[in-house]
C-alpha cells in the first residue's frame, strides 16, 4: 500500500509521527509532502527530529500568506506531486489550509482521500478551520474519526457509511512522550522555577490576535496572574503584538519560543495548568492531567469540558479566579482511545484499499 501524507503545520507533524511509525511494520510505502505552511524551524524541523519522523520526500515551500494565497499555492504545486507518486491513499490531517488543499487536489485528480481527525466540529462558522474540516469530510472517501462524538457528527451529516472510529493519533504520541519525560525537569525560561506553580499559555487564533484591543486585554490579564506564565510565543502572536506595540515581557509573563514536542509535554506535565486558544493543547492538557482554561466560546474537544478539565472563557475579566480553580477529580475516562489509533488507522486504510 502506498500512502501519501500531506502536512504543513505543527499539530499535523505530531499526528504524522505515529502514522509514519505504524506504516513501517507492514512494509508500506509512505510519501511525506510538507507544504511549508509552518516554515519556522521551531514550528517544523524540530518536530521531525524530536518525534523521529522521516524527512519529507517533497517540500512545497509555500510559506506565509493569506488563506487564499497560501491555499492556492499549495493547489498549484500539488497536482504534479500526486501525478508523479500516484498513491493508493492521500491522507490529510486535521483542519489547516494544507488539509483542504490536499483534499481538493486528491478529489479533482481522482485519488482516494482519507481524512484523519474527521468529524470534529466547533459549529463556529467564522473559524477558517471549521470550513476546512467540514469540506474535507464531505470530499473524503474515508473519514477517520477520533472520538464517538466526532462519529455522531459524521452520521448526522450523512457520512456514516464512510466513517470509521479509529481513535485519536495525538493521544498515541502524547502518552508515549509523557512516559519518557515524566521524570525530567521541564525546559523553562529564566525566572520560572519548575518545582513551583506556573502556567503554560499559547495564544495564536485570529480572533484573539488580529484585534489589537482583544489581544491587549488577553496579554494584560495573563500578565496580572499571581503565578508565572510560560508564554509559548507563536510567530503570529509575536508579529501582532509588535505591530500593536504590546509588550509580552511584563508582569507574570515569561515568553519563550515554541518548544519541541517533548519539551512542551514536560512543561505541561509539571504545570499548574494551561491557558490557551489552541485545539490540540486543550486535549493534551487533559491527557497530561493539567486543568485547561480555553479563551474561546466553543471547543471541538467537548469531552474535556464534560469531564471537568476544561473551562471555556472568552472573556478575561475574571481570568485569575478561573485559572487558579481547584484541580478536578482525576478521571478514568479515555474518550480519545487507548494509544493505538495509528495502528487502527493503517488497518482501516488496508481494509478499504481499492
Model feature map: region roles:
Residues 92-93, 143, 264-304:
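A donor-sugar binding/catalytic signature common to diverse glycosyltransferases
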Residues 48, 149, 311-354:
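Leloir-type glycosyltransferase catalytic cores
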Residues 60, 145, 255-257, 310-315:
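Short acidic-hydrophobic, aromatic-tinged amphipathic segments that line or gate anion-handling sites
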Residues 38-42, 61, 139-211, 332:
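A nucleotide-sugar donor-handling region in carbohydrate enzymes
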Residues 4-7, 13-24, 47, 59-158:
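Active-site and donor-binding regions of nucleotide-sugar-utilizing enzymes
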Residues 37-40, 45, 65, 182-270:
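Donor-nucleotide binding loops and adjacent catalytic segments primarily
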Residues 286-330:
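Nucleotide-sugar donor-binding patch of glycosyltransferase catalytic domains
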Residues 81-88, 193-194, 270, 352:
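Glycine-rich phosphate-binding loop signature in dinucleotide/nucleotide-binding domains
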